[in-house]
């Protein structure tokens, strides 16, 4: 079955950096699990048009303008940070073997440049703040002092694990969408288990499109977020019990949450365009954290990127109204807050921590049970 060609990858070409390069004798460094995920995402075209880690010109353009040096939309810097000792060694190396934490050589980096960067300027450019209470800012300030730019060649997948079983490449998703006969696909980005309002939102999107691609983020998250295994198992359970056959596809996206609000909303849209999605759901405070962003900023930023082929679908918050007897939105429901079953992430976490099953209007019973059965459903 041919790949879904209803939407082109960002930049026009789906990157493929998977090769058979011989790494024998190369200087090697070990990178974090999150950086290893970035390398694999580059290789598979999830980060198209990137073919490697950003060089200085592209890096500075991204943090100052939200675009690559060639003016193509790109809002989140994909970089490899190293300490001074490693940087000095890499300056003299043409090719470097990148090993994941398991010691597996996953890729060869073709070193093009090694450069320093201003951490405060970077944090301000990406996150809009230098407040270290923001997890993205704290991460940026903890980065090593040098960045290495260059293309990568991916040579070996990491070991298979349970959490990787739903990881799909853009080639695989495009083939799956084509096989299902889908021409219009709405992506749903999430870092949480599905509550019923999200289910209703996804099903609403299906009514005018061929299918929905549920794409949870798997990777490092902030304390208090749900752990990856819980998120995936909850979605598997909900899809099994509550979705029409051949209308929902689940695939995990292995990348670190940045909590960059509007900038990350654009990044999320670009990745889902590369997967073959024609639309993406963008809710209030998409990819936000705390009170750092205006709730509508993640929707408003799309007016700065009209050239994106993927179309954002803006939804207000859904809730259950006891008088309307349905899930609805503030635009459609005239009733008082006392009649509304609102969804509070804080309240939901407190209920689960106390072993209480949330209301069926908040979580499907089967989904709630998955969470309650897990010994440690939250990130420490």
Curated annotation (Swiss-Prot):
Keywords from the UniProt entry: ATP-binding, Nucleotide-binding, Nucleotidyltransferase, Transferase
ATP-binding among keywords: yes
Disulfide bonds: none
Listed SUPFAM superfamilies: Nucleotidylyl transferase, PUA domain-like
Highest taxon of source: Archaea
Gene Ontology molecular function, alphabetical: ATP binding; sulfate adenylyltransferase (ATP) activity
Protein name from the UniProt record: Sulfate adenylyltransferase
